[in-house]
Amino acid sequence: MARVVALVLLGLLSLTGLEAVPRVPKVQVYSRHPAENGKPNFLNCYVSGFHPPEIEIDLLKNGEKMKVDRSDLSFSKDWSFYLLVHTDFTPNGVDEYSCRVQHSTLKDPLIVKWDRDL
């Protein structure tokens, strides 16, 4: 009898409160080194604090997708996820760079522009 009660309680606990809450991604776009026109650099898009883990992240140059590398998907202590997408680039003062994020918590893609002065 005690075994049945324990199994029922375990079943009820598994149904309540364990479902993860969707979380909107936070996006940071930055270069590895201070921007200098004509000098090679690395552009990073760090996306954190999101759940569920399915996400699309693109770096854009003048609105066009760039070839990128990405870190492995990882999670924080609070079970939210984070990911780094990066590529090499050479700023020139004319081209516009941004990061586009698509996630189930967002109605429309989130686009964050790179601010060369940060």
Swiss-Prot record:
GO terms for biological process: antigen processing and presentation of exogenous peptide antigen via MHC class II; antigen processing and presentation of peptide antigen via MHC class I; immune response; peptide antigen assembly with MHC class II protein complex; positive regulation of immune response; positive regulation of T cell activation. SUPFAM superfamilies: Immunoglobulin. One of its GO terms (molecular function) is peptide antigen binding. It is found in: Secreted. Residues 1-20 form the signal peptide. One of its GO terms (cellular component) is extracellular region. Pfam families: C1-set. Disulfide bonds join 45-99. Keywords: Disulfide bond, Immunity, Immunoglobulin domain, MHC I, Secreted, Signal. PANTHER family: BETA-2-MICROGLOBULIN (PTHR19944:SF62), MHC CLASS II-RELATED (PTHR19944). Heterodimer of an alpha chain and a beta chain. Beta-2-microglobulin is the beta-chain of major histocompatibility complex class I molecules. This is Beta-2-microglobulin.
